UniProtKB/Swiss-Prot annotation:
It comes from Caenorhabditis briggsae. It is found in: Cytoplasm. Belongs to the TCTP family. This is Translationally-controlled tumor protein homolog. InterPro entries: Mss4-like_sf, Mss4/transl-control_tumour, TCTP, Translation_control_tumour_CS, Translational_control_tumour_p. It comes from the Eukaryota. Keywords: Calcium, Cytoplasm. The keyword Cytoplasm applies. The keyword Calcium applies. Residues 1-181 form the TCTP domain. GO terms for molecular function: calcium ion binding. Coiled coil: none annotated. Its main location: cytoplasm.
C-alpha cells in the first residue's frame, strides 16, 4: 500500500486504497465516498464490512461517525477559515513559495520549477472561480492541526458524477511523499 504524506508535516493525507489519478503531472485526485460507520472503524475502499461482521445491532449505544472515507481514515481536520477566498489566497501564496523553495533546495531543474509555477498558478486561478470555489472544503492533517506550520491543505471538491455527489480530494504532487507500508 502507498501512503501519500505531506513533505512539510509528515501527515498522512491519503493512500492508494482510494481510486486516484494524476492530473497534468500536478495534482493527485482521490475519489472518496460518503460513509456511515462505527467510530474507530477503518474501512478500506472496496471492502464490505456488513458481509464481514454480520448484521448491525440498531439498538446499540455505539457512536456512529459520518463523513468522507478519506477524511475519516486519515484523521483530516476541516478548516472552515479557508472558505474565505482572501484567507485561501494568503495561504496558497505562502504554500507555493514553500514548495518552490523545497524544489530549489533539492536541486530541481529550473525548467521543472518554472513549469510547476505556471501549472500551479493556472490551477489556483481555476479553483478561485466563484462557481467552483463554493464547492470546495479544506482539510489539514493531524500534525498541521496541532500547530505544525507550512503543511498542505487537502482540498475536497464535491463533483456531480452521473447525478451522484463524489467528494474528490486534491493534493499538490510536489508537496507529497509516497511511502510504501
Amino acid at each position: 500500500m502507498l501512503i501519500y504524506k505531506d513533505i512539510f508535516t509528515d501527515d498522512e493525507l491519503s493512500s492508494d486504497s482510494f481510486p486516484m489519478k494524476l492530473v497534468d503531472d500536478l495534482i493527485y485526485e482521490f475519489k472518496g465516498r460518503h460513509v456511515v460507520r462505527k467510530e474507530g472503524d477503518i474501512i478500506l475502499a472496496g471492502s464490505n464490512p456488513s458481509a464481514e461482521e454480520g448484521a448491525e445491532d440498531e439498538g446499540s449505544d455505539e457512536h456512529v461517525e459520518r463523513g468522507i472515507d478519506i477524511v475519516l481514515n486519515h484523521k483530516l481536520v476541516e478548516m472552515n477559515c479557508y472558505e474565505d477566498a482572501s484567507m485561501f489566497k494568503a495561504y496558497i501564496k505562502k504554500f507555493m513559495k514553500n514548495i518552490i523553495d523545497h524544489m530549489e533546495k533539492n536541486n530541481r531543474d529550473k525548467a521543472d520549477v518554472d513549469a510547476f509555477k505556471k501549472k500551479i498558478q493556472a490551477w489556483v486561478v481555476s479553483l478561485l472561480a466563484k462557481d467552483r470555489f463554493k464547492n470546495l472544503a479544506f482539510f489539514i492533517g493531524e500534525r498541521a492541526a496541532e500547530g505544525a506550520e507550512n503543511g498542505q491543505v487537502a482540498i475536497i471538491e464535491y463533483r456531480d458524477v452521473d447525478g451522484t455527489e463524489v467528494p474528490t480530494l486534491m493534493l499538490v504532487k510536489e508537496a507529497i511523499l509516497e511511502e510504501k507500508c
